[in-house]
């Protein structure tokens, strides 16, 4: 991350930095049984235990200390994981709810600001045969910890067809002279922090609001191999016309999600 000239702050760095992902995995399944199997498969692939491991690794990468972990698998499908984090290591006495109801103020300062969470949403539609899996991830920190340090790791771990990313810096912090600072590092695009291999894999477009410190990037996987999008279907068993139909169906679905609107054809 490119930092601005080093500042001497008055007190704690109160800037809140939030990195939000919305990732999509798309496939085609031509029977009800196949669609149900896909939902079960993807639900297991992204179960709460695996997601917890990914988020704990994320904490390690950004240098955050774990305060508390909550994870849950839902019926019939879906999972959630939430991890509360802080900048400095905490002794158990400071975060123990049974410690005469005395909780360190530094812990309270982080409970509403510094967290990492993920929620999953598998779904399908019987008429089209399209199945989608969506996961929402948010890494929100305050202090010197930057969620952008985990950007490449999370993209690689989730291996998605479509990704929308938003990075926001909120609030302000003061230096020792009382001057407010609304951001503490240079950025003009989330793409600045992506590795070259990720940039080569995706087509990307930015929608940024610089004056509000809001940065938005949409990503669409460049390589389209129909075989990778068929669930319980052998590509060799499909007629040319059927292959063409499925490719158009998948392409339309992916473009609609990428652009965030319905496309008539």
Swiss-Prot record:
Heterooctamer of four alpha and four beta chains arranged as a tetramer of alpha/beta heterodimers. Pathway: Amine and polyamine biosynthesis; S-adenosylmethioninamine biosynthesis; S-adenosylmethioninamine from S-adenosyl-L-methionine: step 1/1. Catalyzes the decarboxylation of S-adenosylmethionine to S-adenosylmethioninamine (dcAdoMet), the propylamine donor required for the synthesis of the polyamines spermine and spermidine from the diamine putrescine. This is S-adenosylmethionine decarboxylase proenzyme. The keyword Signal does not apply. It comes from the Bacteria. It holds the Pfam family AdoMet_dc. One of its GO terms (biological process) is spermidine biosynthetic process. NCBIfam families: SAM_DCase_Eco. Belongs to the prokaryotic AdoMetDC family. Type 2 subfamily. Gene3D superfamilies: S-adenosylmethionine decarboxylase. Its cofactor is pyruvate. GO terms for cellular component: cytosol. Keywords: Autocatalytic cleavage, Decarboxylase, Lyase, Polyamine biosynthesis, Pyruvate, S-adenosyl-L-methionine, Schiff base, Spermidine biosynthesis, Zymogen. GO terms for molecular function: adenosylmethionine decarboxylase activity. It catalyses: S-adenosyl-L-methionine + H(+) = S-adenosyl 3-(methylsulfanyl)propylamine + CO2. The record marks 113-114 as: Cleavage (non-hydrolytic). The active site is at residues 114, 119, 142. Binds 1 pyruvoyl group covalently per subunit. The modification Pyruvic acid (Ser) is found at residue 114. Is synthesized initially as an inactive proenzyme. Formation of the active enzyme involves a self-maturation process in which the active site pyruvoyl group is generated from an internal serine residue via an autocatalytic post-translational modification. Two non-identical subunits are generated from the proenzyme in this reaction, and the pyruvate is formed at the N-terminus of the alpha chain, which is derived from the carboxyl end of the proenzyme. Its EC number is 4.1.1.50.
